[in-house]
C-alpha cells in the first residue's frame, strides 16, 4: 500500500481480524486523515482451507459434507451447486417432488441467511433491539431444518439425483404456519427499522454503486440488484423448478446501503411466496432418482466376489464424471455462486474451481470506503454481506 504524499500526519489503523464487525477473520488496514478514510487494504486468507484441492482428491459423495463449510450460513446452496454439476454431466433427471423440496429448502436457507445478515448489520450500526427479534425467527427456520434433515446447520441433505430423505409427517403444515407468521414479522421489521430516522441517517446515501459500475466490478446478487440491474439467476437460468412459480425480482435504483437492505428485506417476502406455492403444489412420487446410482464399481472387481465379502472392506462407490467441462451456477443469498468442473472419466474431478459471490463483491470495498468516515466502514462492509469461509475457501 502506497502512502499518500501529503503534508498531514496520517494514521494507520488495523481493523480485525478479531473485530466483531468484520464478520469473520477479515483484516482491514485503514489509512485515516482524522475521521476520513484515505485508503483501505483488505487482508484475506485467514480461513483458507484449500477447498478446491480437497475437491480434486475426493469423490462427489465424499466431498458433499465439505461444501457446507464454504458459506456455513446458507449451506443448502453449496450443496445444490455440488450436485447440480454432476447431474448435468451425467444427464440425470431429478424427480419433480425432489425438485420442489429442493426449492423449499433453498428458499428457507435464503431467509435464514438474510436474517443472519440483518441482525448483526443492525447491531453494527448501533441498533441492538432488532437483533433479538430477528434471531427469534431464524430459530424457527432452523427448527424446520432440524425436523427435515436432522441438522440445524451443515445439513448434508442434497444428493445426486434427488435428496437424502422425504419430508417427515406434519412438516408441510408446520412450514405453512411459519410462512403465515413470518409475513407479519417482516411488517414488524419495516416499522421497527425502515422508518427509523437514526437508521436512515446511517445508511442512506452511504456506499453508492451505479449500475454500470456494478457490472464492471462483476457484482451479483443484492449488490447488483440494488444498483438498478434486475438480474436474478432463478429467472435467467430457470434451474430446479423456479419457472413454475409466480414471483418477482426485487431491485432498487439508488445503489446505496439502504437499497441493499430493502432488496434483501423484500427478497424474504418473495421467498415466502415461492415456498407457499411449492408446498401447496408439492407433487407425489419418489424423492430420489435411483438410476443416478450408476456408480463406478469396476475398480478392483475381485473384491466384490463372494469369497471376500467378510474379510475385505469394499471401496465406497463413486459417481463417474464424464470427460467434459461445465460451469454451473445458482442464485445464492450473497450473489452468483458457481463452480467450474472438468471431468476426466473418473470418480474425482480433474479441476474444481469455485466462484464465491462474497469474494468478488468484497473487491469493491476499498473504492466504496475512500473519502467516507471511519464509522461508515461498518455500514458499507455490513451491507456487502460476506462470510469469510466462502471468501477464503
From Swiss-Prot:
- Keyword line: Chloroplast, Membrane, NAD, NADP, Plastid, Plastoquinone, Quinone, Thylakoid, Translocase, Transport
The UniProt entry, under InterPro entries, shows:
NADH_Q_OxRdtase_suD, NADH_UbQ_OxRdtase_49kDa_CS, NDH1_su_D/H, NiFe-Hase_large
Q: Name one GO molecular function term.
A: NAD binding
**EC numbers on record:** 7.1.1.-
Q: Where does it localize? A: Plastid, Chloroplast thylakoid membrane
- EC class of this enzyme? translocase
Topology relative to the membrane: Peripheral membrane protein
Q: Which reaction does it catalyse?
A: a plastoquinone + NADH + (n+1) H(+)(in) = a plastoquinol + NAD(+) + n H(+)(out); a plastoquinone + NADPH + (n+1) H(+)(in) = a plastoquinol + NADP(+) + n H(+)(out)
| A single GO cellular-component term on record | chloroplast thylakoid membrane
Instruction: Identify the PROSITE patterns for this entry.
Output: COMPLEX1_49K (PS00535)
Q: One GO biological process from the UniProt record?
A: photosynthesis, light reaction
* Subunit organization: NDH is composed of at least 16 different subunits, 5 of which are encoded in the nucleus.
Query: What family does the entry list?
Result: Belongs to the complex I 49 kDa subunit family.
Q: What does the UniProt record say this protein does?
A: NDH shuttles electrons from NAD(P)H:plastoquinone, via FMN and iron-sulfur (Fe-S) centers, to quinones in the photosynthetic chain and possibly in a chloroplast respiratory chain. The immediate electron acceptor for the enzyme in this species is believed to be plastoquinone. Couples the redox reaction to proton translocation, and thus conserves the redox energy in a proton gradient.
Recorded hits in NCBIfam families, A to Z, give: PRK06075.1 (NF004739), PRK07415.1 (NF005649)
Return the protein name. Answer: NAD(P)H-quinone oxidoreductase subunit H, chloroplastic
Q: What is the species listed in this Swiss-Prot or TrEMBL entry?
A: Arabis hirsuta (Hairy rock-cress)
Gene name linked to the record? ndhH
